[in-house]
């Protein structure tokens, strides 16, 4: 039997077969038959025989795959699409004329802008997400493996107007005319998605969901920046999303290795997510009030918080001391949060301060040079500014006087001045009463003869 077929195989596989043949020479014939069979099957696939029908998602297919009322599962008109393109389009679920499989497409009239086939394999993740500060809107977010002609790769993000969607559902006869709960629309869309082969989650309908580990995960979102772009960071049971300005970021929660907090102030902090591949993504200007929720999410997902180790290293470098490695020390972020809570309890920011701030803002609006005030108002503004300058000078003098009093306790050559004065006057002092003459005259010229100098 010829051994020439071994030369056609990968070197590692050829060596393994050779080892078997040396032990069992009769096996060479079996290996050669297997090789010939594989060649025949490969040629059959190329010629189209024994080949399972599949959809070739191309523009030629789309010309024959028409959409009509008979094969439409669900249609929602005038949806505001934000990604991968920005247009008002129609969202359509329908059954393909080619093989009857479900398809999602975005239409502009009769023109297809984006089509996704094989939904059970192509849709990787889909979810409804709230729109911050706009309760009448909701996002529908979807990621996919490929689309028609591979024109796009970015996630699909569209905004649904709750009122308009409710009206469309009522006009289509999908809801009764007296229904006002938008969740009925969400439930219907989710059911259609399940029938077509994928799931759309709705994590914010109930703020608490249950993940695969049977642990309660609170879904929440917060405002932050990535570089110069402001966006929303969504923490979901299995994913973290930042959007919706390009590039949109989607993380699988299980792919996050660690989190690090930095640039911590009394009001904000930064958080950096580090993936298992070593990629780092920093999000800045996060409000301090969001820390507890992030910390709880991180702990439940068993992500590593590397902030403490970096803080201890920084302390050891600045103080020249070795790190003791105590993991129980409160982090800087926790200290800042505690300080902010203490200040609120102590009433550091009083109502008077807020009133002063409002007055200041109001005065700023009137003196911004926009030309909306009359000339008399401008003159009054100038006089007010002069009065303010005089008041500022007087306040400066008072402040300097207070500063001088405070400085009486400052150290001189490392020794407190108070101690020097005490040493200087160890002997008892004899105090002498000094008579003070009181001027009862009611002159108008009291200032000149009062004995008190005014600045």
UniProtKB/Swiss-Prot annotation:
Changing residue 261 to A: Impairs histone-binding. Disruption phenotype: Decreases nucleosomal density. Increases HTA1 RNA level; simultaneous disruption RTT109 alleviates the effect. Changing residue 291 to A: Impairs histone-binding. It is found in: Nucleus; Chromosome. Residues 305-455 are annotated as: Disordered. Residues 319-339, 402-418 have a biased composition (Polar residues). Its main location: nucleus. The modification Phosphoserine is found at residues 408, 411, 450. One of its GO terms (molecular function) is identical protein binding. Residues 305-314, 420-429 have a biased composition (Basic and acidic residues). Changing residue 269 to A: Impairs histone-binding. Residues 350-366, 376-395, 430-455 have a biased composition (Acidic residues). Gene3D superfamilies: 2.30.29.120, Pleckstrin-homology domain (PH domain)/Phosphotyrosine-binding domain (PTB), RTT106-like. One of its GO terms (biological process) is transposition. Keywords: Acetylation, Chaperone, Chromosome, DNA-binding, Nucleus, Phosphoprotein, Repeat, Transcription, Transcription regulation, Transposition. Residues 68-301 are annotated as: Double PH domain. It holds the Pfam family PH_18. GO terms for cellular component: chromosome; nucleus. The N-ter domain (residues 1-67) homodimerizes and interacts with H3-H4 independently of acetylation while the double pleckstrin-homology (PH) domain (residues 68-301) binds the 'Lys-56'-containing region of H3. Histones H3 and H4 chaperone involved in the nucleosome formation and heterochromatin silencing. Required for the deposition of H3K56ac-carrying H3-H4 complex onto newly-replicated DNA. Plays a role in the transcriptional regulation of the cell-cycle dependent histone genes by directly recruiting the SWI/SNF and RSC chromatin remodeling complexes to the histone genes in a cell cycle dependent manner. In cooperation with HIR and ASF1, creates a repressive structure at the core histone gene promoter and contributes to their repression outside of S phase. Present with 11100 molecules/cell in log phase SD medium. This is Histone chaperone RTT106.
């Amino acid at each position: 039997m010829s051994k020439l077929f071994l030369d056609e195989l990968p070197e590692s596989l050829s060596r393994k077969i050779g080892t078997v043949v040396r032990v069992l020479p009769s096996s060479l014939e079996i290996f050669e038959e297997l090789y010939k069979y594989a060649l025949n099957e490969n040629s059959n696939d190329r010629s189209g025989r024994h080949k399972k029908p599949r959809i070739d998602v191309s523009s030629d297919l789309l010309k024959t795959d028409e959409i009509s009322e008979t094969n439409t599962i669900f249609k929602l008109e005038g949806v505001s699409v934000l990604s991968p393109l920005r247009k008002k389009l129609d969202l359509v679920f329908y059954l393909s004329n080619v093989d009857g499989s479900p398809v999602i497409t975005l239409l502009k009239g009769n023109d297809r802008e984006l089509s996704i086939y094989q939904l059970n394999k192509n849709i990787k993740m889909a979810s409804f997400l709230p729109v911050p500060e706009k309760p009448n809107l909701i996002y529908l977010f979807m990621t996919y493996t490929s689309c028609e002609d591979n024109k796009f790769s970015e996630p699909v993000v569209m905004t649904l107007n709750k009122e308009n969607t409710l009206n469309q559902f009522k006009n289509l006869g999908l809801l009764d005319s007296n229904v006002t709960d938008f969740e009925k629309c969400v439930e219907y869309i989710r059911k259609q998605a399940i029938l077509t082969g994928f799931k759309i989650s709705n994590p914010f309908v109930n703020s608490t969901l249950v993940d695969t580990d049977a642990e309660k995960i609170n879904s929440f979102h917060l405002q932050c920046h990535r570089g110069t772009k402001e966006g929303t960071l969504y923490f979901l049971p299995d994913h973290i999303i930042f959007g919706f300005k390009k590039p949109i970021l989607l993380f699988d929660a299980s792919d996050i290795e660690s989190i690090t907090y930095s640039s911590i102030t009394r009001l904000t902090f930064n958080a950096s997510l580090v993936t298992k591949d070593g990629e780092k993504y920093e999000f800045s200007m996060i409000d301090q009030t969001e820390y507890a929720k992030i910390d709880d999410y991180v702990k439940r997902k068993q992500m590593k918080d590397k902030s403490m180790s970096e803080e201890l290293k920084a302390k050891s470098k600045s103080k020249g001391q070795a790190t003791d490695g105590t993991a129980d020390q409160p982090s800087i972020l926790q200290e800042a949060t505690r300080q902010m809570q203490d200040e609120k309890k102590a009433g550091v920011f009083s109502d008077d301060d807020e009133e002063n701030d409002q007055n200041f803002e109001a005065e700023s609006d009137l003196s911004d040079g926009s030309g909306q005030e009359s000339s008399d108002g401008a003159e009054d503004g100038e006089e007010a500014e002069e009065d303010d300058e005089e008041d500022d000078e007087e306040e400066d003098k008072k402040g300097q006087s207070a500063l001088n009093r405070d400085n009486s306790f400052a150290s001189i050559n490392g020794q407190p001045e108070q101690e020097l004065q005490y040493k200087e006057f160890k002997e008892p002092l004899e105090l002498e009463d000094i008579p003070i003459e009181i001027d009862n005259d009611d002159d108008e010229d009291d200032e000149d003869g009062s004995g008190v100098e005014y600045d």
